């Protein structure tokens, strides 16, 4: 009995989803295989780590020190974060603290610049 590939495909085309599911299970049992999708391989060692560092897309703006002009720094923090006066003051008083987390590089750099111009010491992480 010769089996024609086209006849097999035509037979598959006429099957319902339930029948196809039963067929897959039967093939798995008969040949000892699994129809589960394979996981993608993990990134390599040091080369993968260096590439990940270069491709960083989210940054944290960290206020490391309030500086002498605390009022200006509080105003800058309020502008950047949209916090209320008390929350912004608490954040500035509690330095070093994250001002913003997970922001794009351009936004993070602008926030650091604004804080530095206000008299604070800030950094990008």
From Swiss-Prot:
Origin superkingdom: Bacteria
Xref: Pfam families: Ribosomal_L12, Ribosomal_L12_N
GO terms, molecular function: mRNA binding; structural constituent of ribosome
Keyword Ribosomal protein: yes
Key words, A-Z: Ribonucleoprotein, Ribosomal protein
GO cellular component, one term: cytosolic large ribosomal subunit
InterPro entries in the cross-refs: Ribosomal_bL12, Ribosomal_bL12_C, Ribosomal_bL12_C/ClpS-like, Ribosomal_bL12_oligo, Ribosomal_bL12_oligo_N_sf
Entry-linked SUPFAM superfamilies: ClpS-like, Ribosomal protein L7/12, oligomerisation (N-terminal) domain
An annotated GO BP: translation
Function: Forms part of the ribosomal stalk which helps the ribosome interact with GTP-bound translation factors. Is thus essential for accurate translation.
Oligomeric and partner information: Homodimer. Part of the ribosomal stalk of the 50S ribosomal subunit. Forms a multimeric L10(L12)X complex, where L10 forms an elongated spine to which 2 to 4 L12 dimers bind in a sequential fashion. Binds GTP-bound translation factors.
Family of the protein in this entry: Belongs to the bacterial ribosomal protein bL12 family.
Protein name: Large ribosomal subunit protein bL12
Species in which this protein is naturally found: Delftia acidovorans (strain DSM 14801 / SPH-1)
Gene assigned in the entry: rplL
């Amino acid at each position: 009995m010769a089996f024609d590939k086209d006849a097999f495909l035509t037979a598959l085309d006429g099957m319902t989803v339930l029948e196809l599911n039963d067929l897959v299970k039967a093939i798995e049992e008969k040949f000892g295989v699994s129809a589960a999708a394979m996981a993608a391989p993990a990134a390599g060692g040091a080369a993968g780590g260096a590439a990940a560092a270069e491709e960083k897309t989210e940054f944290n703006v960290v206020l490391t020190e309030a500086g002498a002009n605390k009022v200006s720094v509080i105003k800058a923090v309020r502008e950047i974060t949209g916090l209320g006066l008390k929350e912004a003051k608490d954040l500035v008083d509690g330095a070093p603290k994250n001002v913003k987390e997970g922001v794009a590089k351009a936004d993070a750099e602008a926030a650091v610049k604004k804080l530095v111009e206000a008299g604070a010491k800030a950094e990008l992480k």
